[in-house]
Amino acid sequence: MEPRPEFTVIAGPNGAGKSRLCPFYIRTASFDGDKLMLQLRKDHPEWPDRWISGSVVSELEKQKTKALTEKKDFAFETNFSSDMAVRMVHDFKESGFKTSLYYFGLSSEEDSVSRVIHRMQTGGHDVTDEVIRFNFREGLRNIQQNLRLFENITFIDGNSDYGHIVALHIEKGHIHEVEDNPPQWFVDQFENLFKELNTQSV
């Protein structure tokens, strides 16, 4: 039997290191909407924001449909702050894909804002404070509410230079591990939910 194709979500707040660190964890090239948006703004400075946003969504849907049709691995980088991101997980799961989550965590909205400011000062792309805070709150809420959709889950400390793994859950391998002294963001945001995953898989 051929292995199931895999849908991977690389999630976390702005500034958590998703783009920088995810290549160390997954082999599949990920769809990065922020990167495409920046390129479109550079190529088409005359376009209004709604055209650019629409083009990004259109390209994502195109690549998603291709992956579903061809049963090919697909990876998606996101703040997970939109209903569209949640629907994508359902769509791939219902099509028989293995679902995996790599979540890069930060402690607070302020931490996310400060890291984006630092990134911008070193040549990275900017995001408004309002968007950063929305993405932090809604992305966290959506992940917490939909954690059970994922068969494999890896929590990574966004404050670490090299993507330190905090917790790991692999459903079929019966692996459920948390490091001895996890960062406070994991304790506050996910510790109890993560324990429930282990109870359900027993």
Roles of regions detected by a PLM:
Residues 13-14:
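The conserved Walker
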Residues 97-145:
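A glycine- and Lys/Arg-enriched "phosphate-lid" helix/loop adjacent to the NTP-binding pocket
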